[in-house]
């Protein structure tokens, strides 16, 4: 057992002087001798193939020859000058390497085929030096990037990774063909079967747990979670005792909670079976001392390492783990515990920081090819249940959403339901808030089910709604906060604007106009005429023109029996069973046969650029919206109505594309379909709508009058405001700098939430990152008005790379911590909550998540007085 030494040994020798223009390290004679030996002897091929890869040869011609020899050898065919020449000729490479005579030159060059393995070592060493030169060049580039403003910690970490890759001789590849993976996988399956199904990974020491997991496997991230005092640190040490003391494989614990001596005491207590309390109080018997001395000599050689450095950062853990991987062939890493780690950086919330740790620990597990056990703390969820059993939802920073929750895509601009992503397996780009509160595109790299949990419906003042578990985090100004901790009146972030999608596709404008009119005032039911029925002559004319441009003739009904003038497609003689072109067009967009309460905006509109989105909204508003000036209240009225909630949500989403935040109200109707209205409040957004979107037809006159009125003083509701805590921060900073002017000094002003214009003015005077982000960011601070339980449902979550959040149902939501884990073990001790529990002395390892196998509850005995858990007698 050892303690990690943080001090790297000094380097006595000075670095070599720079010498530019030199050839990279190589030995062409050794390369020729290797290939010549392989052409002469099959045994030489066997000696060489495990030491070299094609990229280890300096000359490209030698790489081609080596690859051809290995291909022939792998197929069981002879590899000599004749067959290799034929293979290279088949590939069109023979002339490139110098023709068949060069192969005979290789044979004549080799002194003896028996030394091919030695020649291969020379080639491998030169290749390693070349990679070191390449890595050094990249490190120099990273250094210059750091001097130009890149994050220094990230630069150092990338430089370390470059050197580590060279030392570990690992060549990164973008992909591996399936055929290259089949045989190694078959070998692993065969090895598991031949060992009777025993653990192939690092054995945990618990028989039943190993039977389910087959041990802890390289590349896995394992979360061990429990409430305080249940024994999660003890379980982590049990894993290490099994790895290092029982099986003599190296392990390391990075402890942010216990000191080195405390950890060693616990290990000795568990191994010598001496009460930890007796050790600490000095009440050990002679028999205890004898057992302790005997076990100390037995475990002193165990390759177990301990690091209790305070304020340990992720970069330090990576650097130390890489060094141990080289020094001691590290097989297991334990981090105790996740919530105590620090990054040294400023994050908008602790939840984001912990999620970053989780992701980096998973990447560390994959990089070093070792299992990483991250100990984590559960929230108070178990204490609120009758049986006190923990659930996956209790994991801190964990949360879930229902299958119907719609995620905003960045590639198409449309929304897609979680359930659809699960069915299709698609992993799209999504819009996400970065640390500056700006919308950025980030990949959703994983979507997964999280079981059945209690779900709450959260409704905002703007009418937006989302269904989530109590543990799902929402963004407050103070940071990411679980839904269970939110209350009515809290302010959370929603997008105030959304950029154009990454892959925009323009639509024919005639089709766009026709589509907007059909959604707003059209009827396209099966076995009924397809009609458009406005009362505005200008709108009728617009549809007539757009239909003509789309090669769709339209005729007008204007007879007395008709309730209103209408346009319908001209009758055409079609074969039986064929629908009209306009019906086929609407069916292709998913709108044919849709009733008014079922309508929605097709994906093609969301893909369109912003100028076409504005055109679509202009004609849609003319068909189903209203724009007017209210002289009684001295303010404008801009709204759109529909019996389809989905259509209202889609229109709200499109308005964000042109930088307009809207509000949704609900009007229940007995005996019919409820209706919804989408309102645009505030002079600023109304002016933006009138200038950038506008309306068509008779409403255009009212729009011009409204725009004229809005240029003067009008009532302007303070809807787009910042949380009060921001206002307090602004006031404190201004007071400290003695910069309060008359506009920012009135006492009554501090009683209310500030409009965004005031922090914007303050931001110009004080240097405060939070105020800057608030004034310039893309977050709208909406108000929680209702939180209601809607029962248990199947729920899902996703992983967003980098920013760890996404837009769902028009609200910014965080993703979960558990998504990075391959295995989640929840620890439960019934007697931790009730000392008289009949199961006293027992503990449950609840395998709540197992990416590569079944879940199960494993019952063990807890002997915490001896700092250990133990298998139950079978």
UniProtKB/Swiss-Prot annotation:
ATP binds at residues 226-233. Its EC number is 5.6.2.3, 3.1.-.-. It catalyses: Couples ATP hydrolysis with the unwinding of duplex DNA at the replication fork by translocating in the 5'-3' direction. This creates two antiparallel DNA single strands (ssDNA). The leading ssDNA polymer is the template for DNA polymerase III holoenzyme which synthesizes a continuous strand; ATP + H2O = ADP + phosphate + H(+). PROSITE patterns: INTEIN_C_TER, INTEIN_ENDONUCLEASE, INTEIN_N_TER, SF4_HELICASE. Keywords: ATP-binding, Autocatalytic cleavage, DNA replication, DNA-binding, Endonuclease, Helicase, Hydrolase, Intron homing, Isomerase, Nuclease, Nucleotide-binding, Primosome, Protein splicing, Repeat. In vitro 5'-3' helicase activity is stimulated by single-stranded binding protein (SSB, Rv0054) at low concentrations (0.02 to 0.16 uM), decreases at intermediate concentrations (0.32 to 0.64 uM), and is inhibited at higher concentrations. GO terms for cellular component: cytosol; peptidoglycan-based cell wall; primosome complex. One of its GO terms (biological process) is DNA damage response. This protein undergoes a protein self splicing that involves a post-translational excision of the intervening region (intein) followed by peptide ligation. GO terms for molecular function: ATP binding; ATP hydrolysis activity; DNA binding; DNA helicase activity; endonuclease activity. Residues 582-660 form the DOD-type homing endonuclease domain. It comes from the Bacteria. Induction: Part of the dnaB-darT-darG operon. Residues 1-25 are annotated as: Disordered. Was identified as a high-confidence drug target. The main replicative DNA helicase, it participates in initiation and elongation during chromosome replication. Travels ahead of the DNA replisome, separating dsDNA into templates for DNA synthesis. A 5'-3' DNA helicase with DNA-dependent ATPase activity; helicase is equally active with ATP and dATP. Requires single-stranded (ss)DNA for helicase activity. The intein is an endonuclease. Homohexamer. Interacts with single-stranded binding protein (SSB, Rv0054). Co-immunoprecipitates with DarG in the presence and absence of darT. This is Replicative DNA helicase DnaB. It comes from Mycobacterium tuberculosis (strain ATCC 25618 / H37Rv).
